[in-house]
Each structure stands twice: as C-alpha cells, then as structure tokens.
Amino acid sequence: MCLRIGGLNVDEFRKLLMKTGLVLVVLGHVSFIAAAVLHGTMLRFVATTRDAVVLQYCVVDILSVTSAIVVILAGISAVILSRYLPSTPLRWTVFSLSVACALLSLTCALGLLASIAVTFATKGRALLAPCTFENTELPTLAPDCPFDPTRIYSSSLCLWAISLIFCLAESMSAVRCAQLVHRLLELRPWWGKSCHHTIQASPEPLDGHDLLSCTS
C-alpha cells in the first residue's frame, strides 16, 4: 500500500498543483495586460473602420481577453484545489477550466498568428485606415492621425508576438494542470493504477493526513 499520486506523495502533489496554478495566474494577467495595451494603442482607433482585416484584429483581441480571464480563473481554482484535494466538485471545476483554457489559448494563438501573417501580407494598411496620407508607402506624422503611424506597424507586431508566446505558454500550462487533476479524478485511459480513496468527506485542508491509498 502506498500514499502517492502519480508517483508523488500528497505534499509534493499539492506543491506541484499550486505552482501550476500560480503560473496560470501570472500568465493570464500578463496576457490580459498585453491585450489591453494592444487595444489602447491600436484597436480603439481602427475599430470604427469597416474592414474585414480590422474585424479579424478585434475578434482576436476579444478572444485574447476572454482566454486570459479563463486562465486566471483556472489558476486560482487550481491553487484552491491544492489545499482542498478531497473536494470532488472542485476537481471537476479545475479540470473543466483547464481543458477550456488549453483550447481557448490554442485558438487564440492561431488567431494571433493569422493576424501577424495578414499584417505582413497587407503591409499594415488596415492599421493606417484612420489616417489619410498622400503616400501610404511612406507614412509620416499627420495632424488628423490619432497615433504615430511610423510606429503602429512595429508596435502591433511586437505586441502580437508577445501575446502569441504567452498564449502558447498558457496552453501548455493548462494541459499540465488538466493532467494533474486527471490523476485525482482517476479517469481512463491514462490512469495506470487501481486506487482507492480514503479522503474525508469535508473539503477542509487535511495537513498531515493521507489522501489516497493506492495498490499497484
């Protein structure tokens, strides 16, 4: 008889789950800030224009914000679960949020990649829609332009690249979190051991108590 979860004892499993949750919280906040900065520096000016490319930019930004919020919620839930492992409803909540995070973050990454590709293909013309220039190939400062047109192209690509990296990191962390909770739920086909719970019914923290009893 052993007191282990996926090769880890209960304390190690709790620490690993808490670290994974904290990573998700940090990544979610950074992604949210990046999406907010992108909206404040670029999208709020071009969102009023009727253009398919601009619409795609806005949809991806909204998706980024939504994904960041879900990631933060999943991270907080994982941290709470690390203290209340016996709670079955909380396990399912964290597992569902983690799967949703992985899918949303991956979708967001694909959308950001598409935005970068479209911007390169169009040379950022959609970003300059609110401004009027005699020569769009050589944009200069104009009194009727609400932003610096000489920097909008590079700034947008930089923010999209940063968001893309964090979305990929969120997706991998969410998958890791889902795998950890998957072990607690004993779901097939990845559960390799026959385990029997000795978890107390109350969701209170059980420091120093055995949570799982496994037999190979």
UniProtKB/Swiss-Prot annotation:
Principal subcellular localisation of the protein: membrane
InterPro entries per the UniProt record, alphabetical: Beta-casein-like
Q: Which PANTHER family match?
A: KERATINOCYTE-ASSOCIATED PROTEIN 3, TRANSMEMBRANE PROTEIN 54
> From what organism does this protein derive?
Rattus norvegicus (Rat)
Q: Which UniProt keywords apply?
A: Membrane, Transmembrane, Transmembrane helix
Q: Which domain of life is it from?
A: Eukaryota
As for family, the record states: Belongs to the TMEM54 family.
Q: Where in the cell is it found?
A: Membrane
Q: Where does the sequence pass through the membrane?
A: 22-42, 62-82, 94-114, 155-175
Naming one, the record's GO cellular component terms include: membrane
What protein is this chain from? Answer: Transmembrane protein 54
How does this protein lie in the membrane? Multi-pass membrane protein
